[in-house]
């Protein structure tokens, strides 16, 4: 009995336990679905931040803060920065450091993943106002705040290992900047100085056998160099100058110009110090062989090193070879009389800051003293009234008078020779805002040095600083106080050029010619070339078949105008469209009492001269300074006295087997050997009626013919053909009007003799063309017409290139339409000369043998361009259509529950692989868990993405799988179909879950699948428990 009872209790307990366990399993599995969904959502928040961010488009960068509220789970805000619509990168400014999610022990470490042009499945669960471009990604089931935009870019955070404690954020912008930095990083080359061969080198003085630095004169270093093959970007060569010269003169810019091939920089120059100059090749030197360079560099006497007159040995060393020259240096003593000497020089000139420094010497002469002396310094040109006060320092020279540097250089930091007495001049020195100063001395019995630092008016084209002294000589006998005073004036000016050709457009003597020759080693053979061609203002780089050596000289020899003698300073900058060799130095100061002088700022030799009048109370030497070298400009600013202003003293030019071709504005000069051909072939368009006779003039074998056909279809002026032959100099002007219409007026067709036949030159070839007839004109010819013929000797010659080609044409093209080519129709005296009939509606018979038949309308020189790129299909309009065919979506809410049980079959259903498959992962029930698998499935639907809009009916069945949220768009009356156009792929990986678990979570019904098994299992337990209980009751009854 006890045993039975115990057995029964045991059975009872087991049965009760089974029932309880089964019930708990059933209930628990039912709740497990909700818990799993909540957990997945929370994990998504943790991993994906705020799922996806769609910014409502803005043309500037916008920062959107998206907040996810998911039931009772924790949420956080993430700041996401989106680029405009064309951006492909989204960066996370700040990643959360600690985000707690249910059932997650590790903090999420976020990393921005950038995927370009990879599809992502999206579903819109909110009404869309701008349906045309709007695309949204909804990865959260409940309340989600989204910003809508035209360009969707998603950040997906991937969990990292537990060992990484700090969030790691990859900013694509930083990566891009780093990449640019790496691209710009300097390429270190090798020293190829040892591979440079000095074929010739010399140092020359353009002004003769001496150099006057105060007159802007300088010497020129000329090199002809040859380089070994295999030069690469970053390779460099050095050469060293002696310390008694520099390459910049008074300019504060310490640079040397670039060596260019046309406008392409082949090598950049820099000053290393201690007289070392380095040229570094750019990537343009790649694949060049047989490279040679002709360099000319201006060298200015350094006033600090060379302080007195005398001979100086100037040297330059390159690859162990020394080029040298010994030349006398003569400085200008300034202006003086028996009592006082005044001298001065512009020490430095800074074009960028509009500032300059000036040094003035004031010293008594021959032991004589002066009373009541007044010294003034004034900007007579370029005064800046709105500028600040200049800085004026007065120094007393303590050394011997004969030791004062003749170069007008003052090392005021040397207190043994220079004493600052500016404070002692309190009340005697006054400075004005307009840049002037005045110093009043009771007695001039000491030598003073005045250092001036001021600024000139920005944009001023002329700067002139005048130092003027008024004084009265001291008398031995005071009773004889009646005497006259004296005045000494010294001007230091700077003439600024905009580096344009002078106003007259004349060309002066060529002094500088920097060539850079090479051969291109890119074909099977070698290709010689150079960027030069027809270098006119509008064209920087043209190709021409004719080798051209181009040099521009923008100064006019002997040009003057300033009695005091201005010094011209040329500052050659790269702003010129014609990057060739410009020279603006005046080679002779003819017509100047004081003499103009030039200084070059780039690579041009600079001519400086300063007058040394002893008989004048007004002395000035002005330095003219030129900045740019675009043809068509003129002199712009002035600077006086001995200023060697040279910022860039070398002008490198590449001329590979090219030149003898100079083009200025619209005038073309072609020089072939000794033959000069000037060709002007652009005449006004012919409109109106061709009227009047055509003249023919032959003078001393100079054949000038004016001929032309009017516009035969409507109105037309006749063009003019000028053909002049004199000693191989041919000037041609030609153009014919339209043909093929009505022709009125008196017209004539002319033929020349063989001797007077004009020559047409194209390139270097001379082509002789004979026409036996004129074109047949279809239309009406009105008025009296005549045809004139000359002998065979007058037949014109057309020259192409350097070869003379005789071409006999039996006829010219038959013209059926409008032909506006520049054609010259000439006939020879052949026996079979065609017959011409005139009068109204008269026809012209002639034979046509050689030239093709021309039909259609040709107006002038025409260029036909074809665009081979097919037009892009209107793909953007396709996605806008799927939204309209989705009216069946209202049926979605009616069957929201039915799709859930058959979910296991969803992956096997054909609808899933079809274009609608992207909708499966984006279902609102479990959008976040499927996110990790989104990339796997969207890859297949990527090709059919254009088919989604084409077959709007198919997306309807998957829409049925949206049980809850589809109801909202139905209420709004708008239907949204999935769009697979996101440029970034969403990836989310749970830190602790395996890939298999994720696969089970892919469909929304994944959780329900496990729930059904649990319910079955729990039900079995409950049935077993009930059976045991019933059995137990039966046992108890027994």
From Swiss-Prot:
Region (4 X approximate tandem repeats): 741-898
Disulfide topology: none
GO terms (BP aspect): cell adhesion
Region (Fibronectin-binding) location: 508-868
Record membrane topology: Peptidoglycan-anchor
Pro-piece positions: 1006-1038
Annotated region (Fibrinogen/elastin/tropoelastin-binding), positions in chain: 189-507
Protein name listed in UniProt: Fibronectin-binding protein A
Organism: Staphylococcus aureus (strain Mu3 / ATCC 700698)
């Amino acid at each position: 009995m006890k045993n039975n009872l115990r057995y029964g209790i045991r059975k009872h307990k087991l049965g009760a336990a089974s029932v309880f366990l089964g019930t708990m399993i059933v209930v628990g599995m039912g709740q497990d679905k909700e818990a799993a969904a909540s957990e997945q959502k929370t994990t998504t928040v943790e991993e994906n931040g705020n799922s996806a961010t769609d910014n409502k488009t803005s043309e500037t960068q916008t920062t959107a803060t998206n907040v996810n509220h998911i039931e009772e789970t924790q949420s956080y805000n993430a700041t996401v920065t989106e680029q405009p619509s064309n951006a492909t990168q989204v960066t996370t400014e700040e990643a959360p450091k600690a985000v707690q999610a249910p059932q997650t022990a590790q903090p999420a470490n976020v990393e921005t993943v950038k995927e370009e042009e990879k599809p992502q499945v999206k579903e819109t669960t909110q009404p869309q106002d701008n349906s045309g471009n709007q695309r949204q990604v909804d990865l959260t089931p409940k309340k989600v705040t989204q910003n809508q935009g035209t360009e969707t870019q998603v950040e997906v955070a991937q969990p990292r290992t537990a060992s990484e404690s700090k969030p790691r954020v990859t900013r694509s912008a930083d990566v891009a900047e780093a990449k640019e930095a790496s691209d710009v990083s300097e390429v270190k080359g090798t020293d190829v100085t040892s591979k440079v061969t000095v074929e010739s080198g010399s140092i020359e003085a353009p002004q003769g056998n001496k150099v006057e630095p105060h007159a802007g004169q300088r010497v020129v270093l000329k090199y002809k160099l040859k380089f070994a093959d295999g030069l690469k970007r970053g390779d460099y060569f050095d050469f060293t100058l002696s310390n008694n010269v520099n390459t910049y003169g008074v300019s504060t810019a310490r640079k040397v110009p670039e060596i260019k091939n046309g406008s392409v920089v082949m090598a950049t120059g820099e000053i290393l110090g201690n007289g070392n100059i380095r040229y570094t090749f750019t990537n343009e030197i790649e694949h060049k062989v047989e490279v040679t360079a002709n360099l000319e560099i201006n060298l200015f006497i350094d006033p600090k090193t060379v302080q007195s007159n005398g001979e100086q040995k100037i040297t330059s060393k390159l690859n162990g070879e020394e080029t040298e020259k010994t030349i006398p240096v003569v400085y200008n003593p300034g202006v003086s009389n028996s009592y006082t000497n005044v001298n001065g020089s512009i020490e430095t000139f800074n074009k960028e800051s509009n500032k300059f420094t000036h040094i003035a010497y004031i010293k008594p002469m021959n032991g004589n003293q002066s009373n009541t002396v007044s010294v003034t310094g004034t900007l007579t040109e370029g005064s800046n009234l709105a500028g600040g006060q200049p800085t004026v320092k007065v120094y007393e020279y303590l050394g011997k008078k004969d030791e004062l540097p003749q170069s007008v250089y003052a090392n005021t930091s040397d207190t043994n020779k220079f004493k600052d007495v500016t404070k002692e001049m309190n009340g005697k020195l006054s400075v004005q805002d307009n840049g002037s100063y005045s110093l009043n001395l009771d007695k001039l019995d000491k030598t003073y040095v005045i250092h001036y630092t001021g600024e000139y008016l920005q944009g001023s084209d002329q700067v002139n600083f005048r130092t003027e002294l008024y004084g009265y000589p001291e008398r031995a006998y005071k009773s004889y106080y009646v005497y006259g005073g004296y005045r000494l004036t010294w001007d230091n000016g700077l003439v600024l050029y905009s580096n344009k050709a002078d106003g007259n457009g004349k060309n002066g003597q060529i002094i500088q010619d920097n060539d850079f020759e090479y051969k291109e080693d890119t074909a099977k053979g070698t290709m010689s070339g150079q960027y030069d061609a027809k270098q006119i203002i509008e064209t920087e780089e043209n190709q021409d078949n004719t080798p051209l050596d181009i040099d521009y000289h923008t100064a006019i020899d002997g040009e003057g105008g300033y009695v005091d003698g201005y010094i011209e300073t040329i500052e050659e900058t790269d702003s010129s469209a014609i990057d060739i060799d410009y020279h603006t130095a005046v080679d002779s100061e003819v017509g100047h009492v004081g003499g103009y002088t030039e200084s070059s700022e780039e690579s041009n030799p600079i001519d400086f001269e300063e007058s040394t009048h002893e008989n004048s109370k007004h002395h000035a030497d002005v330095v003219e300074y030129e900045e740019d070298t675009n043809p068509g400009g003129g002199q712009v600013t002035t600077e006086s006295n001995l200023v060697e202003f040279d910022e860039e003293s070398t002008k490198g030019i590449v001329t590979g087997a090219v030149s003898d071709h100079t083009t200025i504005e619209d005038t073309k000069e072609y020089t072939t050997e000794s033959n000069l051909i000037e060709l002007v072939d652009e005449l006004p368009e012919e409109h109106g009626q061709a009227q009047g006779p055509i003249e023919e003039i032959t003078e001393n074998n100079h054949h000038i013919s004016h001929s032309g056909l009017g516009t035969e279809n409507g109105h037309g002026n006749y063009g003019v053909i000028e053909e002049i032959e004199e000693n191989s100099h041919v000037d041609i002007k030609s153009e014919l009007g339209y043909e093929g219409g009505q022709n009125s007026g008196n017209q004539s067709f002319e033929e020349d003799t063989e001797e007077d036949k004009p020559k047409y030159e194209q390139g270097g070839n001379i082509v002789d063309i004979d026409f036996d007839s004129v074109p047949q004109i279809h239309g009406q010819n009105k008025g009296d017409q005549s045809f004139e013929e000359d002998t065979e000797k007058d037949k014109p010659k057309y020259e192409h290139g350097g070869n003379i080609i005789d071409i006999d044409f039996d006829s010219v093209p038959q013209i059926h339409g409008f032909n506006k080519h520049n054609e010259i129709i000439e006939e020879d005296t052949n026996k079979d000369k065609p017959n011409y009939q005139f009068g109204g509606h008269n026809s012209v018979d002639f034979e046509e043998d050689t030239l093709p038949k021309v039909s259609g309308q040709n107006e002038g020189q025409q260029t036909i361009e074809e665009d081979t790129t097919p037009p892009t299909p209107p793909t953007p309009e396709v996605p806008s259509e799927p939204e309209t065919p989705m009216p069946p979506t209202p049926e979605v809410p009616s069957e929201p529950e039915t799709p859930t049980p058959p979910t296991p079959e969803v992956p096997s259903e054909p609808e899933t692989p079809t274009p609608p498959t992207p909708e499966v992962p984006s279902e609102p029930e479990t959008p976040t868990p499927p996110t990790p698998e989104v990339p796997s499935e969207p890859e297949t639907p990527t090709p059919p993405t254009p088919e989604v809009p084409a077959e709007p009916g198919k997306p309807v069945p998957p829409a049925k799988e949206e049980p809850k949220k589809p109801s909202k768009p139905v209420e709004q009356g708008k239907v949204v179909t999935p769009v697979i156009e996101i440029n970034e792929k969403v990836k989310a990986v749970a830190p602790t879950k395996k890939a298999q678990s994720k696969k089970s979570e892919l469909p929304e019904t994944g959780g329900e699948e496990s729930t059904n098994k649990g319910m079955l299992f729990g039900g079995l337990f409950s049935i077993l428990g009930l059976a045991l209980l019933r059995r137990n009751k039966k046992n108890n009854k027994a």
